[in-house]
Amino acid sequence: TREEYTRFLLPDKALTRRFYPISIEEPDEELTLSILSGSIPSIEYETKVKNTFSANTTERILRTLISISIPANQPDDQPAKRPELPLTLLEMAFSYAALSGKTALSCEYIEQAVHHSNRLRKEIRTNFTCAL
């Protein structure tokens, strides 16, 4: 982060010659959706769990994960930018399915991922349902 660069690297001349700050804007919702969609095949490969939802249902699920991941729904001390939190929730859902010995992703595991995430406020976690 810029804060870490200023705090740790900038005071050290040798490090400032080797590291340069690069500013990257947070992706918008559409780009985040594209990133998440593009990540599914590698998550499937790693977990051996398949996404068997239709393309439309998958898009609705991903948009839901993106929408609940807004900063207002996160604890004040742990803000995350897109696509970090929705991607983490997606990976957790696949992992819960894999740990349960399942080969297909279901709403149950998406709900588990959200309910067990400490990166969302309690009221978001407890009220979340994967309504398709």
Regions found by a protein language model. Name each.
Residues 1-132:
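AAA+ P-loop NTPase nucleotide-binding core of proteostasis motors
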